[in-house]
Amino acid sequence: MLNFYEGRNAVCDLPLERTLLNHLGWSGNLCAPAPYVIDAHPELIERIAADDMVRGITVACGGFFGPQGRQLRIPLADPRQNEKIESFSYNGLQITNFEMESSALAGLARLMGHKATTCCMVIANRLIKEANTGYK
């Protein structure tokens, strides 16, 4: 979504974007248009993140199923996508979850001069096929 707004490069973490694209082997039209990386506001992270919270990178996917590495009855363009995402590391951080909104919210907030961060609770671990059904 952020690729459609002026000022996108000014608010994105361009070195992380390049590193992720190289790691995934994405180029041209394979799998996704140019992804964008938005850092959470550091002040808000320090205010919210407790010592018992896992800090990591959230991948905000551009859709359900295929963009999140889930195969239906149609083969994925990159069947190793989840494996590549799981092995990615940048400045000591790893990708800890998939969802669809965080980067858009953080990016739009930053473009408008606001501070934003997200705190995500892991409900389903698709890799080991477990879900937390008792969360509140």
Predicted regions and their residues:
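Glycine-rich phosphate- or other oxyanion-binding loops that anchor nucleotides, phosphorylated ligands
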Residues: M1-K136
